Amino acid sequence: MIVPFEHVLILAGILFALGLVCVLVWRMNLIMLLIGIEVMLNAAMLAFVGGAARWGMADGQVFSLVIMALTSAEVSLALAMVVYLHRRKRTVDADEFSELKG
């Protein structure tokens, strides 16, 4: 059974909206900010894969692989920064990044 393309887009829109709410509501907590960005990127990836399946083109699937590589690099760098901030300041508040130097 194939899922209709409209359902895929609705699910991707709901996921993107949830990620956006997470980013907007918890923008001071860096962990929640990262989770929200990841959910939004996964929603975009779902829309690309759904579109690729709908029109029979591999471009959306290739672009989803690019998004996966981008998100893995983004998460590894951001989590390293969060761990550094937590060790130095004992908090994961986004405002504390402005006080770090070096």
Swiss-Prot record:
GO biological process: ATP synthesis coupled electron transport
UniProt-listed Pfam families: Oxidored_q2
Superkingdom: Bacteria
Chief place where the protein resides: membrane
Record bears the keyword Nucleotidyltransferase: no
Reactions mediated catalytically: a quinone + NADH + 5 H(+)(in) = a quinol + NAD(+) + 4 H(+)(out)
Transmembrane intervals: 5-25, 30-50, 65-85
One MF term in the entry's GO annotations: NADH:ubiquinone reductase (non-electrogenic) activity
Keywords from the UniProt entry: Cell inner membrane, Cell membrane, Membrane, NAD, Quinone, Translocase, Transmembrane, Transmembrane helix, Transport, Ubiquinone
Subcellular location: Cell inner membrane
E.C. code: 7.1.1.-
Subunit-structure text: NDH-1 is composed of 14 different subunits. Subunits NuoA, H, J, K, L, M, N constitute the membrane sector of the complex.
Job description of the protein: NDH-1 shuttles electrons from NADH, via FMN and iron-sulfur (Fe-S) centers, to quinones in the respiratory chain. The immediate electron acceptor for the enzyme in this species is believed to be ubiquinone. Couples the redox reaction to proton translocation (for every two electrons transferred, four hydrogen ions are translocated across the cytoplasmic membrane), and thus conserves the redox energy in a proton gradient.
Record's protein name: NADH-quinone oxidoreductase subunit K 1
Origin species: Geobacter metallireducens (strain ATCC 53774 / DSM 7210 / GS-15)
